C-alpha cells in the first residue's frame, strides 16, 4: 500500500525564517524524508545547522549517492541541484533553471517521477516563480501539494505563482500541521481519467528530466516536448523551445537552461538595464572624446572643426541624459 513519505520543500527570499519555523513544528518521529532547496547560489550555507537547532529532526547537506532516510532533513548544498534517483539522492552541477542552482523545479520534478502519489511538495516564500512548474509536476503525478499563504510570506511571488497547483494554501503553522496529517496517509486511488493524465504527465516529465541530466539527446527531447519559440536563452544565447503540456508558459534550451515566463522576463529586464548602461557609458565617453577633440582644434585655430566636435558632444550628452532618465524611471 502506498503511503505519503517524501516531502520536497522549496524556498527563496525570506526562506531561512520560514524553514526554521517549519522545522520547529515537525514531530521527532516524522515518518517521512524531507528534502529542501533554498536559493543560496554558490555561497556558503549554514542552513542545516540552523534547521537542526530549530527542531527535533537532524538536518544535513545532502551527499551525492547517499540513501535517504525517514525522519531526516536533506538540504541542497551550494551550487548543486538536488534530485531524487530511486532510493538515493543525487547532486548535479547541471544547467541553471530560472537562473538558480540549486533550483527548486529539478527537485520537485524528480520527486514527482520517483515518488508519484508518495510525494508531498511545498512552496514557501520567494521571488519570481521557481517551484511552480515543479509543483505542477508533483500534482500531475498524484502527489499532494501545499503552498504558503502569500499573506504570510516574506516574498509573495513564489507562493502566488504556485497557488494554481496547490491542494492547500496555509500559513507556515498550518502547513506544518497539514503535513503531519498527510504524512503516512494513503493517497486516494486515481480514477481512469486521472490515471491517464498521470501517465501522460509522467512521460513528459520523464523526457524533460532525462534530457536535463544528459541521459538522452536534448535536441530530440525538445522536439518531443515543444516547439521553437522566438526567444533566445539569456544564459547561453541558444534557441528556446516552448514546452507543451503545461498550464504554465515555460521554455527550455538544448543546453538545459529552463525558464518560466516570469523568470525569463526578469532576466530580459536585467539584459535591458545592462544594455542601457553600456550605451550610456559609450555616449558619455563619446562626449568626453569629442570635447577633447574640440579643445584641440580650438587651440589649432580650426573653429569649424571645434564647432563640429562640440555639436557631436552636445548630442551625445543629450542622448546619455535621456537614457539616464529612463533608467531612473524603471
Where are these regions (language model features)?
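Conserved acid/base catalytic micro-environments in cytosolic active-site loops
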Residues: 1-295, 314-328
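Short, charged, amphipathic alpha-helical segments
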Residues: 300-314
Amino acid at each position: 500500500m502506498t503511503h505519503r513519505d517524501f516531502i520536497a520543500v522549496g524556498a527563496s527570499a525570506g526562506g531561512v525564517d520560514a524553514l526554521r519555523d517549519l522545522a520547529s513544528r515537525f514531530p521527532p518521529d516524522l515518518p517521512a524524508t524531507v528534502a529542501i532547496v533554498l536559493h543560496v547560489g554558490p555561497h556558503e550555507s549554514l542552513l542545516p545547522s540552523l534547521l537542526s537547532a530549530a527542531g527535533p529532526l537532524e538536518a544535513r547537506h545532502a551527499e551525492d549517492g547517499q540513501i535517504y532516510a525517514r525522519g531526516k532533513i536533506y538540504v541542497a548544498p551550494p551550487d548543486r541541484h538536488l534530485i531524487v534517483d530511486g532510493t538515493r539522492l543525487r547532486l548535479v552541477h547541471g544547467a541553471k533553471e530560472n537562473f538558480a542552482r540549486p533550483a527548486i523545479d529539478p527537485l520537485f520534478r524528480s520527486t514527482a517521477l520517483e515518488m508519484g502519489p508518495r510525494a508531498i511538495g511545498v512552496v514557501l516564500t520567494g521571488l519570481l516563480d521557481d517551484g511552480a512548474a515543479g509543483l505542477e509536476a508533483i500534482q500531475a503525478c498524484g502527489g499532494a501539494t501545499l503552498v504558503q499563504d502569500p499573506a504570510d510570506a516574506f516574498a509573495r511571488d513564489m507562493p502566488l505563482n504556485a497557488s494554481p497547483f496547490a491542494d492547500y494554501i496555509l500559513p507556515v503553522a498550518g502547513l506544518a500541521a497539514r503535513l503531519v496529517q498527510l504524512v503516512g496517509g494513503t493517497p486516494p486511488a486515481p480514477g481512469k481519467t486521472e490515471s491517464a493524465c498521470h501517465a501522460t504527465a509522467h512521460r513528459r516529465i520523464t523526457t524533460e528530466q532525462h534530457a536535463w541530466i544528459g541521459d538522452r539527446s536534448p535536441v530530440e527531447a525538445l522536439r518531443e516536448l515543444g516547439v521553437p519559440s522566438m526567444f533566445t536563452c539569456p544564459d547561453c544565447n541558444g534557441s528556446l523551445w516552448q514546452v507543451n503540456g503545461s498550464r504554465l508558459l515555460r521554455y527550455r534550451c538544448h543546453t538545459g537552461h529552463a525558464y518560466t515566463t516570469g523568470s525569463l522576463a526578469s532576466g530580459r529586464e536585467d539584459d535591458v538595464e545592462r544594455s542601457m548602461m553600456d550605451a550610456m557609458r559609450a555616449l558619455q565617453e563619446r562626449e568626453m572624446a569629442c570635447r577633447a577633440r574640440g579643445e584641440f582644434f580650438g587651440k589649432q585655430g580650426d573653429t569649424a572643426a571645434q564647432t563640429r566636435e562640440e555639436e557631436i558632444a552636445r548630442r551625445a550628452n543629450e542622448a546619455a541624459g535621456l537614457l539616464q532618465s529612463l533608467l531612473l524611471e524603471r
